[in-house]
Amino acid sequence: FSLTGQPNAMGGRETGSLSNLLPGHRDAANAEHRADVAQYWGVDTLPEKPGLSAIELFEQMQNGSIKAVWIACTNPAQSLPDQTRVRDALATCPFVVLQEAFRTTETARFADLLLPAASWGEKEGTVTNSERRISHVRKAVAAPGEARADWAITVDFAQRLEARLQPD
């Protein structure tokens, strides 16, 4: 049972998957936290300004400031407050990528590109519950068709992007 309505929300906080957080619940606005993570990652600095919240992201999409969005592992057209605004923003955005296990979600209606992702039970991983207890999730069945684990989709994209960004 998830108190937040998002089964792995705590895991997202621990890994720094929210726009205002760094891994380990570190605050992106805290200079000491940024320096610690930058040193661990082997980079000089991290941006001082945190990213947009989910609500701010959809506001920026709706007013045309954001021209492309990649949505992974969530269904904001169904789960975020003010669904009318979210759906209007998705309809306005010129390019919407959705990484999702199901093509019938409310958000999928707005996708220009649907990347088939494996669902729970079709991939290995961990889930952190509200008590911060980490559980290993074992793959029970193979993912259908071209569906892959989320990390594999992300790594493949990053490698292709890196190859295109290499100077000639």
Predicted regions and their residues:
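Beta-strand segments within the central parallel beta-sheet cores of soluble alpha/beta enzyme folds
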Residues: 1-3
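Non-catalytic alpha/beta scaffold blocks inside enzyme catalytic domains
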Residues: 6-168
